[in-house]
Amino acid sequence: MSSFKEFYTTEVVPKLQETFGYKNVMQIPKLEKIVLNMGLGEAISNIKIIDSAVEELKLISGQQPVIRRARKSIAAFKLRQGMPVGCMVTLRHERMYDFFNKLVNIALPRVRDFRGISGQAFDGQGNYTLGVREQIIFPEIEYDKIDKIKGLNITIVTSVQKDDEARELLRLMGMPFKN
């Protein structure tokens, strides 16, 4: 068991039980998955961007990403059905906890002018989405070897349906919210 999952079971779970008064251990909120998504609209004109994005996402997550393809043709964007438009990876279990630990303790503090993340980005179902403007905040990405700075979306899916319970879970796990 990773040390961060151990921290969750020993420190976070008792505090959540005390705060929300859960009677059953299955009611206690937990992380279900973390989805990393890189949308690459400029890949329409340059296919090599997809290859570099897949490699960078593989380094960040430790898992092979899936290339996402366009579902429909859109003439205004010069997009054809089946063209690659991005890549994504879904993390669960040990890799999810390791990535969350790395995100909270290493990557987010490396963001320029970082003062915390917004507490407003919950979707009403207990999931949190965070946009990262630069992939270079992750320690696995070497600044000299990237050809273009790309952003990515990080969606943290929790097992609860209420935003306040999910916010408390993430706060106790070390997510640096503003205020």
Swiss-Prot record:
GO terms for biological process: translation. It comes from the Bacteria. The keyword Thylakoid does not apply. GO terms for cellular component: ribonucleoprotein complex; ribosome. Pfam families: Ribosomal_L5, Ribosomal_L5_C. The keyword Coiled coil does not apply. InterPro entries: Ribosomal_uL5 (IPR002132), Ribosomal_uL5_bac-type (IPR020930), Ribosomal_uL5_C (IPR031309), Ribosomal_uL5_dom_sf (IPR022803), Ribosomal_uL5_N (IPR031310). Keywords: Ribonucleoprotein, Ribosomal protein, RNA-binding, rRNA-binding, tRNA-binding. One of its GO terms (molecular function) is structural constituent of ribosome. Belongs to the universal ribosomal protein uL5 family. Part of the 50S ribosomal subunit; part of the 5S rRNA/L5/L18/L25 subcomplex. Contacts the 5S rRNA and the P site tRNA. Forms a bridge to the 30S subunit in the 70S ribosome. This is one of the proteins that bind and probably mediate the attachment of the 5S RNA into the large ribosomal subunit, where it forms part of the central protuberance. In the 70S ribosome it contacts protein S13 of the 30S subunit (bridge B1b), connecting the 2 subunits; this bridge is implicated in subunit movement. Contacts the P site tRNA; the 5S rRNA and some of its associated proteins might help stabilize positioning of ribosome-bound tRNAs. HAMAP family: Ribosomal_uL5_B (MF_01333_B). This is Large ribosomal subunit protein uL5.
